[in-house]
Each structure stands twice: as C-alpha cells, then as structure tokens.
C-alpha cells in the first residue's frame, strides 16, 4: 500500500512468475542483430523525434542514460545511433535512477556549448533483469520501459509542445544503501559469483530517511538560484519509486498540502522504472501547463544521486 504500485510492465512475464526460475527469459541475440536494449531505445527515440518534428538527420548527439547496460561495449548509444542513421557522437551514461536528469544536463550543456545542436537522451530500462524476484523487499517494485527526450537549440525548435530548460542541478553523495555489485571482476573470485549482492539490493528505510531530505533541499535551492520561489512551481515530476516518499518530498517542497496534480503519480501503473519514471510522469502530465508555467523534473537514487531540471512551457 505504501509503495503505491498496482501493476507494471516487464519484457517477459513467464520467466518471472515461474517459481523454478523467477527471472525473465530474454534470449541472447547474435552480433548481427540489434540488441534488445537498443531496440526499445530506438522505438522511444523515433516517437520522441516525431513529436519534436525532427528526423534522425537532425540529431548530432545521443546519450543513453539508464541504470544498467546489457554489455560493456560497444556502447548501446552507438548501436542506436547506427540504427537511427544519426550523425555526430553517442555514449552511454549510468547514474542509476538519476541517469535521465544527468543526461538532460549533459545534453543541455552540449547544446549550449556548441558541441551539438540536437541531442537525444534515451533511457531504456530493463530493470526486471537485475532484480532478485525472490526477495520480498524488492520483487514487486520494478518495471521495464524506455523513454526518450529531444534537447535542441531554441532557434531550431518548431514543436508547439516544447519546454525551455531554465536551470539544472546535480548532486552525488556516496552510499551503499542501494547497491548492485555485478560486474566484470566477479569471475575473478568464484566464491562470489551469483551471490545475492550481484543484483539490486537496498536498505529501504535508510534510503527513505536520507534521500527525502536531500531531494527537497535540492529542489528548493535550484529554484532559488534561478530566481524562483517554490510557489512558482506548477508541477513536480518526481522519480517514481515510492508513493510515500513522493508525498513527503512534495509536502516539504511546496510547504502545504497538495494533490496529485501538483506531483503526478505513474508508478501505480508502471511501478519503479528507474531513471525513466520522472520522464514518464512529465510525458503524461504536462499538457495542461500554460505558456510560461514552470515545473521541475527530479530523479534520485543509488549513489546517492539527485538530478533536478527546471523547465518552462514555451
């Protein structure tokens, strides 16, 4: 009940609900086939480009920003670049659940600095594959999804559904309270292969207590540094991890009782989709904002990491 999660989407259901298996069935593909993570990333990218009135030829930067990559190299972003037929450069970024907002700042910096004119930030999250489905503390939490956002120069923007990035703020602080020790060094010590720590694991209560305070402080300071009061924020598109967590953050930031219009919830349908959650909330709950109204996209998670992006409806 406290989580707010009622359903979720996964890449493969049969493997997850098989009591003898309890992890998804995702067949390995040959090197001549597009990878599963790139495939869902391409689908999200095509949709985002269509909504922005752009084509792949307009794109000169791609950032795949998500909590886990299916391989070390070549970068999933470069695979997507080839599949789309885009130019420029592409790279992968992992800042766990904050990856999308960190990617948005990197994209905005690239556009402002002149190293790119149009950047795709793509978050293909297959969380079901790095989750321990036998662990009652986390098995119900996550879902799979892919999102994409187009970041471009104002003078090239032709979309009637655009938002201006007016301020970003990133913060990290080391903690092992959310951790996944899977990596290429695991095979160098056979005693640790496939042990519990090689999948997502968290100390939920500790995370709740420590992260909420950090998040509301960051949103308020980011707003103030941009010359805004929290009363100027029409909407909080928060990381979709836990309903109680978001309710507490929203109440602290806004300094009042709030409703779901102030801080929309999508985790009841999608569950925790890691870095993609705040982007889905933004996608689904932005249409009613009038020109000039402001909101903040904020994600937070392992690291600890927090990213907040202030946006204004054009």
For each of these PLM feature ranges, what is it?
Residues 126, 154-155, 169-175, 239-242, ...:
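Glycine-rich beta-alpha junction loops
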Residues 48, 59-62, 103, 150, ...:
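Buried hydrophobic positions in well-ordered alpha/beta secondary-structure cores of metabolic enzymes
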Residues 65, 94, 119-125, 151, ...:
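Short beta-strand segments
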Residues 9, 14-95, 225-246:
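Conserved beta-ketoacyl condensing-enzyme motif
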Residues 73-76, 104-105, 130-136, 177-178, ...:
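Short acidic, glycine/serine/threonine-rich loops at helix termini
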Residues 32, 38, 42, 68-69, ...:
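Claisen-condensing/thiolase-fold acyl-transfer catalytic domains that form or cleave C-C bonds
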Residues 114-145:
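Flexible, glycine-rich active-site loops centered on histidine and acidic residues
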Residues 1-35, 135-209, 213, 217, ...:
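Condensing-enzyme catalytic core mediating Claisen C-C bond formation in acyl metabolism
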């Amino acid at each position: 009940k406290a989580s707010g999660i009622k359903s979720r989407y996964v890449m493969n259901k049969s493997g997850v609900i098989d009591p003898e298996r309890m992890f998804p069935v995702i067949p390995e593909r040959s090197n001549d086939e597009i990878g599963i993570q790139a495939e869902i990333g391409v689908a999200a990218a095509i949709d985002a480009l269509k909504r922005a009135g752009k084509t792949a030829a307009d794109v000169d930067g791609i950032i795949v920003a998500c909590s886990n990559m299916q391989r070390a190299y070549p970068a999933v972003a470069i695979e997507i670049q080839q599949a789309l037929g885009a130019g420029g450069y592409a790279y992968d970024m992992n800042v766990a659940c904050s990856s999308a907002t960190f990617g948005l700042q990197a994209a905005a910096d690239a556009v402002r600095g002149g190293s790119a004119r149009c950047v795709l930030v793509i978050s293909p999250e297959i969380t079901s594959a790095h989750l321990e489905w036998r662990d009652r503390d986390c098995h119900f939490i996550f879902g799979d999804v892919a999102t994409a956002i187009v970041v471009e120069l104002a003078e090239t923007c032709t979309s009637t559904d655009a938002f201006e990035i007016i301020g970003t703020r990133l913060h990290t602080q080391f903690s092992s309270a959310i951790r996944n020790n899977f990596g290429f060094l695991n095979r160098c010590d056979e005693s640790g292969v496939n042990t519990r720590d090689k999948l997502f694991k968290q100390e939920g209560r500790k995370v709740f207590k420590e992260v909420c305070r950090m998040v509301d402080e960051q949103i308020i300071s980011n707003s103030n540094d941009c010359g805004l009061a929290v009363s100027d924020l029409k909407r909080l598109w928060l990381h979709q991890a836990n309903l109680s967590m978001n309710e507490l953050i929203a109440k602290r930031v806004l300094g009042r009782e709030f409703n779901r219009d102030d801080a929309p919830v999508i985790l009841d349908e999608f569950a925790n989709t890691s870095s993609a959650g705040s982007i889905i909330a933004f996608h689904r709950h932005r249409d009613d904002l009038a020109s000039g109204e402001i909101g903040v996209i904020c994600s937070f998670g392992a690291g600890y990491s927090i990213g907040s992006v202030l946006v204004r409806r054009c």
